[in-house]
A protein has these predicted regions:
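Short, flexible segments with low predicted structural confidence
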Residues: 19-21, 45-46, 93-94
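A ubiquitous structural signal for well-ordered alpha-helices
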Residues: 29, 33, 45-48, 118
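HTH-adjacent hinge/linker in prokaryotic transcriptional regulators
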Residues: 1-41
Length: 173
């Protein structure tokens, strides 16, 4: 039986079955994410993060809280992280960025300004970019400097919730 990442639970299941299905979703997600990891990329990103004076994390909607958690964790070790939330702040911080910043863009498939506008601004000001996305997504006009992949098995337009994607992002951050 194939696991359905879009609808891991249904209304006719018992509480026990729901708990087991969510557990299975999370276990499969962690395994898939670990299998997509490039240790080489991870090493290079860690080095770029250490070198950067400021890290800027760009994301949207449900992933904002993960970015804020990452910001908190990095601040505990003395690293400055910006998490601009609205589009105006994102554009402003991207435009004032430079090669001393490191931009992390988190997007499943590049919706909204994360797909085209911000990457172009960051590329123009020579800010190194880490893209955290599904396996089959990258920028249109150029490649990111670094890329890590999240579990690609959710349909982002037809699903019960982003259980898999959000756990994958949390695991990476």
């Amino acid at each position: 039986e194939n696991f359905n990442f879009d609808f891991p639970v249904n209304q006719f299941q018992t509480h026990y079955e729901i708990i087991q299905k969510i557990k299975e979703d999370y276990e499969q997600t962690l395994n898939l994410t670990a299998n997509l990891f490039s240790l080489d990329q991870l090493r290079l990103i860690a080095s770029a993060m250490k070198k950067a004076q400021i890290i800027d994390v760009y994301t949207s909607a449900g992933n904002i809280n993960f970015a804020l958690n990452f910001q908190f964790q990095m601040q505990e070790i003395g690293k400055q992280v910006n998490v601009p939330i609205d589009e105006y702040q994102q554009r402003l911080i991207a435009a004032s960025s430079d090669e001393n910043h490191l931009a992390i863009i988190i997007t499943f498939g590049g919706r909204g300004i994360l797909s085209d506008i911000l990457p172009r601004i960051l590329h123009k000001v020579k800010t190194p970019i880490v893209l955290i996305s599904s396996y089959d997504y990258t920028f249109k006009d150029f490649d990111p400097d670094y890329q890590l992949y999240i579990s690609p098995y959710e349909n982002h337009y037809k699903k019960i919730s982003s259980f898999s994607t959000r756990l994958s992002i949390l695991y990476i951050l």
